[in-house]
Every structure is written in C-alpha cells, then in structure tokens.
C-alpha cells in the first residue's frame, strides 16, 4: 500500500455567497455586539469608543466539530481593528473553511476486480460511510483520519484494508483514490488539494 501526497493550489473563491455568516465584535474578551447575519450591518456605521477590537466572523447555526456531507461546512475568520478618534475605518474579514474535505474514488481497474466496496472514514469526532460510487465530499474537523476499505472480489472473498492519514489540516481537500496495479497489489493514493473556499466579509 502506497500513500502519495501532493499539494494542488487553487484560486480563491469569489462572488456572492449563500453562507449565513454571524459576526461578533469583541473587546477585552467580551462580546459587545453580535449579529446572526453580517449582511444586516451593510451600510451601517458603528460608533465605538477608541481602542482595539477583534471582529470575529463564523458560520451561523453550525457546529465546527460536525462530521458529514452537505450543510456541514464551517467557515471562520477574525481580524483585529484599532478604533481611533474621528477616523472611519472599514473592516474586512476573510472567512476560510475551518475543516478539511474528504472524498473517495476508485479506478476503473479497481471496479473491474471487486463487485462490492465501500470506505468508512473516521476521526475522533465521527465517521462517514462512503458507499459504493458515492461522489460527494464530506467535511471533518481537522484531526488524524482513518480510512477503512471493505470490499468483496469477484470470487466472493471479502477483505478490509485500513490506512491512517496524519497531519490533517483545515482548508485542505483529501482525495482518496483506490487502485489495483497490474501485479495485483493495491495502491492507496491521496491527493491533497489546498482549497481555499474563502468568503470575504466587509463592513
């Protein structure tokens, strides 16, 4: 079993987002202003005492530790801003994917040799079963992963194959691909795609 990792940079996502982003305005560790949807502050000026603040933006009504397919993506970001007397200061927060993405694929050669297969991917926060020919990506909090492949060959013999994925980082897409070489040995390849999935919050 081989594990290959490469990093593929991708361009920054732009445009309008349907993601609901909440926003906290924090001073000295205390939230002094909260909105469930940052767009409610568009065009609004905030009058604040001078000082240093933290503007924190994050996915509303979601759990950063959730595991699963659609709807589980969690975005977060923060920036410091210094408020000065008689100075109007715009603020921009870049919200990035706070989890990793995982997808599972199989080569045509693999599919020809096995009539049934599935892959369970899990970490300390939960697990996702990638059933046969599942094409969606799942979201996981960034922590070491274990991928367990269960398969049945054309002779009706069943096998399992486990592999650990370490040094897992947020904002990366881990694409797991299973293959069978001409010599009959299995290959386990991982391509790491440094997907940004950025949302820009400007107030």
Language-model-detected regions and their locations in the chain:
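Extracytoplasmic cysteine-anchoring/structural motifs
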Residues: 1-26, 33, 40, 45-50, ...
